Every structure is written in structure tokens, then in C-alpha cells.
């Protein structure tokens, strides 16, 4: 699963997600992509589950790019622990996603195979997404 090799600080504030994505909103690698329509956190497990579903559907042909990286640590306190005594330990990592962000890109396959694979990936993700083509975005 994806997670940072080293971080400057172990723990992070929760943060806010106002507005839409400015960075990562253009398709740079593939022909077909998956674009987020709402803000949210996507865990490294969800990113990996969607990637596996896509690669199994595509079988041999094509290439897939993951355009998001889970770099935000999420902490959790142990069960039945009293309040106070500091923040809990890091449990997992998430990628912060805003509307308009491209999550995955694909190329080297027919449109039917690409849309089928991206539909499988949509089912694995906790945010609403839409399938986009490079030709549609470059208007």
C-alpha cells in the first residue's frame, strides 16, 4: 500500500477542503481518466483496491497511472481509552481529494475496456467520480 517513506512531522491537523482542485485537474498521461466530483479522503487501501480492480479488468493491455498519493496521516486512539493524554498514533494515510481532481489515468486499450475498468474503480472509491476523456477536457 502507498504511504510516505519519510515525513517531516508524524502527525497532522485535520484540515478543511474548501473549493475545487487547481492542481492535478488536467490529464497529462493517459487517454481516459477518473475525475472526482466531491471532496473527501481516499485511503491507501481504497486506492489499491481500485487499482487492482482496474488491472484485472484490463488484463494485459494498456497502462494505468495513479495520480493521487496518500500523504496525510490519520491518527486514532486505542479503544476504551480515557480522553486527554495527547493525540493517538498514526493508523493509516489518506489522499485529500477535491472536486475536479484526476484520480487515475489509462491508455492503450479500447474505449469499452477503459470505461469498464474505470466503472469498477468507481465502485471502490468513497467519493462521486466521473469518467473523462482527454479530448473532452482540452476544449
UniProtKB/Swiss-Prot annotation:
Signal peptide: none
Known partners and oligomeric status: Part of the 50S ribosomal subunit.
GO cellular component labels: cytosolic large ribosomal subunit
GO terms classed as biological process: translation
RNA-binding found in the keyword field: yes
Region of interest called Disordered, as start-end residue ranges on this chain: 1-23
Molecular function as annotated in GO: rRNA binding; structural constituent of ribosome; tRNA binding
Function: Binds 23S rRNA and is also seen to make contacts with the A and possibly P site tRNAs.
Gene from which this protein is expressed: rplP
Family: Belongs to the universal ribosomal protein uL16 family.
Residue intervals passing through the bilayer: none
Keyword vocabulary terms for this entry: Ribonucleoprotein, Ribosomal protein, RNA-binding, rRNA-binding, tRNA-binding
Gene3D superfamilies: Ribosomal protein L10e/L16
Keyword rRNA-binding: yes
Top-level lineage group: Bacteria
Biased composition, class Basic residues, residue ranges: 7-16
Pfam families reported for this sequence: Ribosomal_L16 (PF00252)
Name of protein: Large ribosomal subunit protein uL16
Amino acid at each position: 500500500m502507498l504511504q510516505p517513506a519519510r515525513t517531516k512531522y508524524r502527525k497532522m491537523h485535520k484540515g478543511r477542503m474548501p473549493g475545487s482542485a487547481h492542481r492535478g485537474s488536467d490529464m497529462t498521461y493517459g487517454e481516459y481518466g477518473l475525475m472526482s466530483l466531491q471532496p473527501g479522503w481516499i485511503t491507501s487501501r481504497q486506492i489499491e483496491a481500485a487499482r487492482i480492480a482496474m488491472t484485472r479488468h484490463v488484463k494485459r493491455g494498456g497502462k494505468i497511472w495513479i495520480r493521487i498519493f496518500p500523504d496525510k496521516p490519520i491518527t486514532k486512539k486505542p479503544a476504551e481509552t480515557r480522553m486527554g493524554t495527547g493525540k493517538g498514533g498514526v493508523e493509516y494515510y489518506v489522499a485529500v481529494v477535491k472536486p475536479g481532481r484526476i484520480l487515475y489515468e489509462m491508455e492503450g486499450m479500447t474505449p469499452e475496456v477503459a470505461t469498464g475498468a474505470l466503472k469498477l474503480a468507481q465502485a471502490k472509491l468513497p467519493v462521486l467520480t466521473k469518467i473523462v476523456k482527454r479530448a473532452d477536457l482540452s476544449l
